[in-house]
Design a protein with these regions (language model features):
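Structural signature of PLP-dependent enzymes
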Residues: 17, 21-28
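Long, low-complexity segments enriched in small/aliphatic residues
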Residues: 27-43
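Conserved C-terminal structural/oligomerization subdomain of aldehyde/semialdehyde dehydrogenase
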Residues: 1-6, 50-53, 57-192
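Intrinsically disordered, low-complexity coil segments
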Residues: 11, 38-41, 89-93
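Conserved small-domain helix->loop->beta segment predominantly found in fold-type I
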Residues: 9-18, 41-52, 66-69
Length: 192
């Protein structure tokens, strides 16, 4: 129940939600929420309020759409706004393909299931859909300093900050092979 999510200053550790990072982020999120309020292709089923009189607070908002390519399904919002699209069970594989192709972004993603087959299928088919992929966990669950983190596609270079792989972004690795006894014949020894 979103009504139980306490929102306020990050100095108060009893708050679960705090303000978004800056006014630009607030304005972007508020504009998406306002758009949904007047759009026949989507509806707000929870939340939808915002206030910047003291801080940039966006109420956790859930949007329901019948259009799997609705703008809030394809855009990185970076705020407490999530859009839901309900698919038919018979379209599971088509829906996975749709998820993989819908957005140019690929920072994080998550699937929730108790069906081991569905988990494996989704994990395999969504291989390039998220730099960090979560199974039965929230997609914002990176453990800073303990878990490599980074997105692909338009979300970044998938460098995995916090891991040795990140070093590859800043260097130009190459392999050098030197032979101290140059070949005198093109044939491998086993060919003679």
């Amino acid at each position: 129940d979103l009504a139980t999510f306490k929102m306020g200053s990050p100095e108060d550790m009893s708050n679960f939600i705090t303000a978004v990072i800056h006014e630009g982020s607030f304005d972007k999120l508020a504009s998406y929420i306002d758009r949904v309020k007047t759009d026949a292709n989507a509806e707000i089923i929870a939340g939808g309020n915002y206030d910047k009189s003291e801080g940039y607070f966006i109420e956790p908002t859930i949007i329901l759409t019948k259009d799997p390519k609705y703008t809030t399904m394809c855009t990185e919002l970076f705020g407490p706004v999530v859009t839901i699209y309900v698919y038919e069970d018979a379209t599971w594989l088509d829906t996975l393909a749709l998820v993989d192709a819908t957005s140019e972004y690929a920072l994080t993603g998550a699937i929730f299931s108790t069906d081991r087959y569905a988990i494996t299928e989704a994990t395999n088919l969504l291989e390039n859909c998220a730099g960090n992929f979560y199974i039965n966990d929230k997609p914002s669950g990176a453990v800073v300093g303990q878990q490599p983190f980074g997105g692909a596609r338009a979300s970044g270079t998938n460098d995995k900050a916090g891991s040795p792989q990140n070093l590859l972004r800043w260097v130009s690795p190459r392999l050098i092979k030197e032979t101290f006894t140059p070949a005198t014949d093109y044939r491998y020894p086993f060919l003679s």
